[in-house]
Amino acid sequence: MTKFCDEFGGEILDGVTSDQILDFLNRITEGTKQQTRHVRYGHLSAFFNFITANIDADFHNPCSTPILRKMFKAKPIPSWEIIEKDVIDEIIFRTDKPRDRLILELMARGGMRIGEVLKLTPADVQDRKLTLKNPKSGKRREHVFIPQKVADRLKAYIRDNNIQPNQRIFPICYETARTMVKKAGEKVGIRLRPHDLRRHAATYASRSGVPIEIVSKVILRHANLSTTQIYLGKVPDTEAMRWIENLYA
């Protein structure tokens, strides 16, 4: 609202037109994601609605036009197909190459992004706790927690390959890793992408009873729960019935 006040502070609000609002919103949201555009529009529209509801019932909200609502509407939430645990397990167990299996496990068991996996060095590994330097969130560092069996395999891989503390554990490019994941999925007849494995880590934890706050803040390391809820996808009827039955059995 500061930018709005700077631009329109000297004007009578009744005189602000929809065209002016459109121009203003386009300028302050240039280069941003659609969700950001929607939020900025929502804040401004709520401000004008407040005036109508509390100050002047005859005031017309300049944001309330079909073209503005269409241009700044929220992006539809994607519906992800959730891959079941037995399928993920089969993919991992059928991957013979130690390097490739570890990459798959770190994503599927630790909820890591492919880019985070490829940046790992031995210096980042403290048994079951992995340190991510300069993560996507913009924080100085974040931490990932992995199962003991995966941690043991990771340490053995580092030792057996004589990887030095500041060398990358997996010195391959993103495209090579993406292709490996795709081929791993093809072995069991599914289309598999790196992020499907991270999404599986969250979904499996959630359906196993892990509190959503832990799924969000620890496994996925999201800033807010709304992003996590997109990851978790839809709960099928059979899953819903199983949980209700267990709850009241």
Regions found by a protein language model. Give the residues of each.
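Short, basic (Lys/Arg/His-rich) helix/loop patches that form interaction surfaces
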Residues: 163-167, 178-218
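Conserved tyrosine-mediated DNA breakage-rejoining catalytic core shared by Y-recombinases
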Residues: 110, 115, 119-156
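Basic, Lys/Arg- and aromatic-enriched nucleic-acid-binding interface segment
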Residues: 85-114
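DNA breakage-rejoining catalytic core of tyrosine-based enzymes
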Residues: 72-89, 137-148, 163-168
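Short, polar N-cap/turn motifs at the start of nucleic acid-interacting alpha helices
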Residues: 125-127, 191, 210-230
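N-terminal core-binding DNA-recognition domain of tyrosine recombinases/integrases
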Residues: 1-77, 161, 187
